Amino acid sequence: MKKKDILIVGCGNLLFGDDGFGCEVVSKLEKMNLPDNVEVIDAGASGAYYLMTLVDEDIKKIIVVDAIDFDLEPGTIKKIDVDELPNIKKYSFDAHNVPLAPFLKDLHNKGIEVVVIGCQGKEFTMPDIKPGLSEEVAKAVDKAIEIILGEIKK
């Protein structure tokens, strides 16, 4: 069995509108015939917790898929460089929110290739529960998958 050296992590919460983008993308990826060296994880709203437990010496590349708010047109896909991630000076651990950016930067500094595929959301409904993606973001799921498949081949 080939070792898993590419990890695709979908982040978000399906209950809060477009925040569920990453979960929708990995749900589709899980049904695809991907190379044996690729592992797909739906990390939900706990992306950092999952990454901290899953990253080992075999991982060469991590692709994180998540909804973003960069003031773009809703449904716009943006490949985000590690240097563009928010500059949070320290980790802030609590029961619900662990910033992912510092952890991804640390992984990058350790030689792991980090790719973030973000989709500009339209409706982030938290704390109000509203399952389902907006039309614009739902249309962007396949485009994100296309980009991810390209990243796997690199």
Curated annotation (Swiss-Prot):
Listed Pfam families: HycI
InterPro entries registered for this protein in UniProt: Pept_A31_F420-red_hyd_d, Pept_HybD-like_dom_sf, Peptidase_A31
EC numbers on record: 3.4.23.-
GO BP of this protein: protein modification process; protein processing
CDD domains documented for this protein: H2MP_F420-Reduc
Organism the protein comes from: Methanocaldococcus jannaschii (strain ATCC 43067 / DSM 2661 / JAL-1 / JCM 10045 / NBRC 100440) (Methanococcus jannaschii)
Gene3D superfamilies for the chain: HybD-like
Hydrolase is among the record's keywords: yes
Family designation: Belongs to the peptidase A31 family.
UniProt name for this protein: Putative hydrogenase maturation protease MJ0253
Keyword Zinc: no
Keywords from the named record: Aspartyl protease, Hydrolase, Protease
GO molecular function: aspartic-type endopeptidase activity; endopeptidase activity; enzyme activator activity
